[in-house]
Amino acid sequence: MGARARMLQRLRGHAPAAPSTTLDALDARIDAHFTARRALGPLAPNERIAQFQRMLEAAHAEVICASAATWAADLAGRLAAAGVRNLLLDTACAEGQALKAALEAALPAAVQARGYTRPIEEWKAELFDTIDAGFTVARSGLAATGTLVVVPDANAPRTVSLVPPLHVALIHASTLHADLHAAVAAERWRDGMPTNLVMISGPSKTSDIQQTTAYGAHGPRALWVVVVTDEDRGTDGQQGAAA
């Protein structure tokens, strides 16, 4: 046995043995705390939306509430009015397809929808210089903090929500949770943790030593959040988000 192995053996021998029930007990205490807190002030679905909107707007994000039937056309008009000419989005998802169709139908020459189809090395300059906005779909949201839960993938990598000066995120109202604890439990994060889970609560901002706040230093300087009131998606998402 070498010196390293002997040292590790001594350390393990002196380490106190943790009771097998420690983690289970801690989980139970955490669950009880958050369950009791939510029981003191349960929020109806419309109240969760209102709280989510308040928290985001307090962080200088813009929130757009729209129906499942109108959000794409509404957003297309807003993008054109804001001077967006090149929009980066995931054309493989249903929401991306709907927005692309709305842009082509109403504003075929105003806003170009672009997909993330090439390695960044092949179009880095074009991406940083010409893309005005990125569109993503959040997996869920946290009403207590006004937070978007975004899981990047190959069609919509983190670059889409990080590089363009404007990030437009869509979230279905049925996926809003009361808080982080409720989201973790309802979506069973422990069963499949993603390698890159992003939580966004506003546009990128930073402050210097003089407490001067600047937006866009490390990411998008503006954030639009489209909340789709989508009762037609069924009850599964609503029940999961109600926890």
Please identify what each model-predicted range represents.
Residues M1-A243:
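The feature marks the mature, well-folded catalytic cores of soluble enzymes
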